[in-house]
């Protein structure tokens, strides 16, 4: 009467198979959730990349437009002399350094050849006696140059064309200003 019930073993097998199937389904569900999360993360990253690329393209287009406008202005103003202001100190140096006002205008009209800075102290900037801390443009060539303050148009320095040993101002960076 207490003999082994063959159905009891079969039921247990089915029960074990059901548990394995349940675990497998849970595993599949977890992996699907992880896959869905990764897919959403990828979609978000793709959207961010697309936005960044659009932003970069707009900035590059704006830069290209600005460079085009700058080049148009440069072409339009090529050979034109900026409103030069020559103070008494520079006028006093001109004859002894081999310069005339026409020499200065001609040198400037040939175009920029470098950059510098105007860092004159207040006592060296009559009539306003306000110190300067401005970018400046260099015209000419080493040993034969004119430096003009970009903001004020003042000629801030002329080299000594008569002195073959003239040492250029250390603030001068030679090279076409528009190529930098």
UniProtKB/Swiss-Prot annotation:
It comes from the Bacteria. The keyword Nuclease applies. Residues 54-76, 160-171 have a biased composition (Basic and acidic residues). Keywords: Antibiotic, Antimicrobial, Bacteriocin, Endonuclease, Hydrolase, Nuclease, Plasmid. The keyword Hydrolase applies. Residues 74-180 are annotated as: Nuclease. Gene3D superfamilies: 3.30.2310.30, Helix Hairpins (1.10.287.620). InterPro entries: Colicin_D/E5_nuclease, Colicin_E5_C, Colicin_E5_C_sf. Residues 106-116 have a biased composition (Polar residues). GO terms for molecular function: endonuclease activity; RNA nuclease activity. Residues 24-143, 155-180 are annotated as: Disordered. Its EC number is 3.1.-.-. It is an enzyme of class 3 (hydrolase). Belongs to the colicin/pyosin nuclease family. Colicins are polypeptide toxins produced by and active against E.coli and closely related bacteria. This colicin is an endonuclease. This is Colicin-E5. It comes from Escherichia coli. The lineage of its organism: Bacteria, Pseudomonadati, Pseudomonadota, Gammaproteobacteria, Enterobacterales.
């Amino acid at each position: 009467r207490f003999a082994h019930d063959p159905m009891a073993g079969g039921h247990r097998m089915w029960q074990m198979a059901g548990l394995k199937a349940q675990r497998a389904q849970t595993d599949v569900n977890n992996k699907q959730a992880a896959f869905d999360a990764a897919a959403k993360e990828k979609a978000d990253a793709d959207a961010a990349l697309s936005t960044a690329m659009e932003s970069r393209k707009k900035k590059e287009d704006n830069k290209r437009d600005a460079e085009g406008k700058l080049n148009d202005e440069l072409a339009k103003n090529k050979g034109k002399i900026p409103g030069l202001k020559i103070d008494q100190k520079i006028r006093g140096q001109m004859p002894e350094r081999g310069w005339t006002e026409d020499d200065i205008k001609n040198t400037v009209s040939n175009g920029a050849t470098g950059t510098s800075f105007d860092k004159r102290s207040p006592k060296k900037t009559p009539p306003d006696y306000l110190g300067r801390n401005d970018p400046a443009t260099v015209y000419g060539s080493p040993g034969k140059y004119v430096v003009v303050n970009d903001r004020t148009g003042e000629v801030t320095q002329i080299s000594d064309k008569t002195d073959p040993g003239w040492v250029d101002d250390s603030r001068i960076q030679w090279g076409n200003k528009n190529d930098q």
